[in-house]
Curated annotation (Swiss-Prot):
Protein EC: 1.3.7.7
Subcellular location(s) per record: Plastid, Chloroplast
Main location: plastid
Job description of the protein: Component of the dark-operative protochlorophyllide reductase (DPOR) that uses Mg-ATP and reduced ferredoxin to reduce ring D of protochlorophyllide (Pchlide) to form chlorophyllide a (Chlide). This reaction is light-independent. The NB-protein (ChlN-ChlB) is the catalytic component of the complex.
Binding annotation for [4Fe-4S] cluster: D36
Phylogenetic lineage: Eukaryota, Viridiplantae, Streptophyta, Embryophyta, Bryophyta
Keywords assigned by UniProt, alphabetized: 4Fe-4S, ATP-binding, Chlorophyll biosynthesis, Chloroplast, Iron, Iron-sulfur, Metal-binding, Nucleotide-binding, Oxidoreductase, Photosynthesis, Plastid
Pfam families: Oxidored_nitro, PCP_red
Family: Belongs to the ChlB/BchB/BchZ family.
Protein name as it appears in the record: Light-independent protochlorophyllide reductase subunit B
Source organism per UniProt: Physcomitrium patens (Spreading-leaved earth moss)
Comment on bound cofactor: Binds 1 [4Fe-4S] cluster per heterodimer. The cluster is bound at the heterodimer interface by residues from both subunits.
Length: 510
């Protein structure tokens, strides 16, 4: 546990609550002190849905600490069972309430005797895993619970559907453009004459989970959630899965070829060929292929970018930048430290350096050092970009409200390639745009940013030096500012004047 004002991945209970609130008619009870119960507010603010967040906080207060939690937790489970009549109630502690070392499984067993709903305790170690790992584990736990229950009751139907079909696993609440990606994946599968059997957890019912084995294969678009479930289904029900993220032209084609392989394995006498579809989509439907060869995109050749995000999006965007658009990636990184090996394997050869960290100050210092033309990252990298005057395109969670768009903005599939190409191209400052604005005035009244990125700096710019900095063209201003600050630190100078600026320039050119 650590104190931070920014976290890329939240605590474990947030992942569990995201999965529980994605299902229909599932209620989550969070055993937590006041302050840990911000999930309701966060989801209500960000997710553009009409329904209330199905999460109740069973507050740990002084009375609970004096008398124990059992009575309160069991009462809350029974009350929600009567009020909401959910199919499933998920009980989860938080990392704070886990300190009490209570036997919550005993509370669940006791509540199960009087509740009409199924009741389970989220099987997650709150000290060892983060939000994404907990979400992956909770989804697998819920799927396992209902499939084993159906197997015991003899109601499990494992006969495959007549036509090729797939389960889409890993679309869930507060995900980055997840709803749009889901629509695009459905459209992609429909074009391939593959029916969608189930989408979980988003909008799915736990009662329908016993139908999962009827699909021919599982599609897992994101590594962060769904992979454990797909591995469980493969091991216990022999269901193959495709885990190639269909992001960008090359990887979308590769994903479709994997789907073709699994479909042909099940119907060897009636093989399908998706190559004509891939060819048509790449040449005529996706605009990204010809755009990447156009004169507009060639303006970006040799420009340097930095990428940072979750493992799935950061790896995919890095490959798109380097392989499909000819942009040099100075550094690519992820905050998914648990997936470091896979990430390194995916981006090897596509970037100059790799960074795996969940400390935003390390990311900020790396960006300041590399001085890229554009950043592709999370909400935090957008803030860093604003402070350094570097444009930023948001490509990964965690994000704020502007990345839960009302319009159709998928990142996956062939329509996703168009969105990504737009995002990449529009993120770079074009030509002399900034400089012309400064020369001719216009309506751009922003002041020069003189704050340094590092939080421990004590450098200040006086008024005259700020005016002097303002005269420098925007496309080199950031570099000159950083070089001047570096010179000042080396010489133990705390206030930067015009004289210091010229001294720094002379020292650099010497």
């Amino acid at each position: 546990m650590k104190l931070a004002y920014w976290m890329y991945a939240g605590p474990a209970h947030i992942g569990t609550l995201r999965v529980a609130s994605s299902f229909k008619n599932v209620h989550a009870i969070m055993h937590a002190p006041l302050g840990d119960d911000y999930f309701n507010v966060m989801r209500s603010m960000l997710e553009r849905e009409r329904d209330f967040t199905p999460v109740t906080a069973s507050i740990v207060d002084r009375h609970v600490l004096a008398r124990g939690s059992q009575e309160k937790v069991v009462d809350n489970i029974n009350r929600k069972d009567k009020e909401e009549r959910p199919d499933l109630i998920v009980l989860t502690p938080t990392c704070t309430s886990s300190i009490l070392q209570e036997d919550l499984q005993n509370f669940v067993d006791r509540a199960s005797t009087t509740s009409n709903s199924d009741v389970i305790l989220a099987d997650v170690n709150h000290y060892r895993v983060n939000e994404l790992q907990a979400a992956d584990r909770t989804l697998e736990q819920v799927v396992r619970y209902y499939l084993e229950k159906a197997r015991r009751q003899g109601t499990l139907d494992q006969s495959l559907t007549k036509e090729p079909s797939a389960n889409i696993i890993g679309i869930f609440t507060l995900g980055f453009h997840n709803q749009h990606d889901c629509r695009e994946l459905k459209r992609l599968l429909q074009d391939l004459n593959i029916k969608v059997n189930k989408v979980i957890p988003e909008g799915g019912s736990v009662k329908d989970l016993q139908s999962l084995p009827k699909a021919w294969f599982n599609l897992v678009p994101y590594r962060e959630i769904g992979l454990m479930t797909a591995i469980y289904l493969e091991k216990n029900f022999g269901m193959p899965y495709v885990s190639i993220t269909p992001m960008g032209i090359v990887d979308t084609a590769e994903c479709i070829r994997q789907i073709q392989k699994h479909v042909n394995n099940l119907i060897p006498n009636k093989k399908v060929d998706y190559e004509p579809y891939i060819d048509q989509q790449t040449r005529f439907v996706s605009q990204a292929a010809w755009f990447s060869r156009s004169i507009d995109c060639q303006n970006l050749t040799g420009k340097k970018a930095v990428v940072f995000g979750d493992a799935t999006h950061a790896a995919s965007i890095t490959r798109i930048l380097a392989r499909e658009m000819g942009i040099r990636v100075g550094c690519t990184g992820t905050y998914c430290k648990h997936d470091t090996e896979w990430f390194k394997e995916q981006v090897q050869g596509f970037c100059d350096e790799i960074l795996t960290t969940d400390d935003h100050t390390e990311v900020g210092d790396m960006i300041a050092r590399i001085e890229p033309s554009a950043i592709f990252g999370t909400q935090m990298e957008r803030h860093i970009g604003k402070r350094l005057d570097i444009p930023c395109g948001v490509i990964s969670s965690p994000v704020h409200i502007q990345n839960f768009p009302l319009g159709y903005r998928p990142f996956l599939g062939y329509e996703g390639t168009n969105q990504i190409a737009d995002l990449i191209y529009n993120s770079f400052t074009l030509g002399m745009e900034d400089h012309l604005l400064e020369i001719f005035g216009g309506h751009d009244t922003k002041e020069v940013i003189t704050k340094s990125l590092s939080t421990d700096t004590d450098l200040t710019w006086n008024y005259e030096s700020q005016l002097e900095l303002n005269k420098i063209p925007g496309f080199v201003r950031g570099k000159i500012k950083r070089n001047t600050e570096k010179f000042a630190r080396q010489n133990n100078i705390t206030t930067i004047t015009v004289e210091i600026m010229y001294a720094a320039k002379e020292a650099l050119s010497a």
